[in-house]
């Protein structure tokens, strides 16, 4: 697997669990890059020993998983010209080496896609908070963005260098970066392929550094523009319907002009939904709404 680089962000790990995972991983992958994301000083000895055997990029302070992944991807793109695929994995034992290999193999065959290692959330091993969070995020992601993803929280992802270049500049410094990448795949028409992986939670996932309040807010506020988009889209459709209704009511019988009004307003709504860049949604819809009202 010399054409694959495994990228692992590390922040205050359970050293025993991480080492057991690493011992297995090193037997299958020659290229492993770690991000020391400002680990506590009590981990200095372990991380220093790790740096003697592997490449470790060190953050002086904790900058967040998103920043760590982006810095790691940038480093790999610059220093591994012969590699083709990057696989991101967690250090807490949630991802088996076999599953990492499976995702890497699928990525090699699908260089145009983002590969997600997805868990079975119906499994009794999954903590309730993880099930709940995934259901909410999965449904919001599909409702607002149109992206179908069964495991929005997975840290096991594989991608070609070309896909990595498209995702490295995505906004987000902490856990929201991974969610933002899923949104970006829809915007940039990057296919997502899912690989079923083993569901592993050690000690109810107690080593996770995800803050249920702060990090959830960071994740869900990403969808605020899409909520406004839906609102303004509804306003546009309503205005067009009303205008068409007024124009046609004296010409056609009631069922026909109601149907015509609905058809016209729906067509215009679809055109707006498909062609307006998300960065300019709010401004465009506000301006358009004002113009239509004044017509």
Which residues does each PLM region occupy?
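Hydrophobic helical membrane-anchoring modules
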Residues: 1, 8, 15-16, 170-248, ...
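Hydrophobic targeting segments
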Residues: 2-8, 24-25, 31-35
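Short, well-formed alpha-helical segments that are part of the catalytic scaffolds
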Residues: 11-27
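Acidic helix N-cap motif at the loop->helix transition within catalytic regions
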Residues: 16-19, 41-50, 98
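A conserved acidic beta->alpha catalytic loop
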Residues: 36-44, 93
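Acceptor/aglycone-binding surface of glycosyltransferases and processive sugar-polymer synthases
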Residues: 61, 67-76, 97-167, 171-175, ...
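Short beta-strand-to-loop acidic/aromatic patch adjacent to the donor-nucleotide binding site
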Residues: 80-94
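Short, high-confidence coil segments that cap the C-terminus of an alpha-helix
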Residues: 81-83, 110-112, 190
């Amino acid at each position: 697997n010399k054409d694959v680089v495994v990228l692992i962000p590390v922040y205050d790990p359970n050293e025993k669990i991480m080492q057991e995972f690493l011992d297995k991983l090193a037997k299958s992958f020659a290229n492993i890059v770690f991000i020391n994301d400002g680990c506590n000083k009590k981990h200095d000895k372990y991380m220093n020993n790790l740096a003697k055997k592997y490449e470790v990029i060190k953050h002086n302070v904790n900058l967040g998983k998103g920043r760590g992944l982006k810095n790691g991807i940038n480093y790999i793109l610059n220093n591994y010209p012969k590699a083709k695929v990057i696989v991101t994995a967690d250090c807490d034992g949630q991802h088996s080496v076999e599953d990492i290999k499976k995702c890497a193999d699928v990525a090699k065959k699908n260089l145009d896609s983002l590969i997600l290692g997805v868990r079975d959330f119906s499994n009794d091993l999954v903590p309730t908070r993880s099930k709940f969070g995934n259901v909410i995020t999965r449904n919001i992601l599909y409702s607002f963005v149109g992206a179908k993803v069964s495991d929005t929280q997975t840290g096991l992802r594989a991608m070609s260098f070309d896909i990595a270049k498209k995702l490295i500049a995505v906004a987000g410094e902490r856990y929201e970066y991974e969610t933002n990448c899923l949104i970006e795949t829809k915007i940039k028409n990057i296919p997502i392929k899912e690989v079923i992986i083993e569901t592993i939670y050690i000690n109810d996932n107690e080593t996770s550094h995800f803050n249920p309040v702060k990090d959830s807010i960071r994740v869900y506020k990403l969808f605020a523009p899409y909520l406004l988009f839906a609102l303004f889209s509804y306003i546009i459709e309503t205005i067009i319907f009303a205008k068409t209704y007024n124009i046609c009511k004296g010409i056609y019988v009631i069922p026909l002009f109601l149907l015509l009004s609905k058809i016209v307003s729906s067509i215009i709504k679809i055109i707006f939904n498909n062609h307006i860049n998300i960065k300019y949604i709010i401004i465009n819809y506000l301006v358009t709404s004002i113009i239509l009202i004044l017509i």
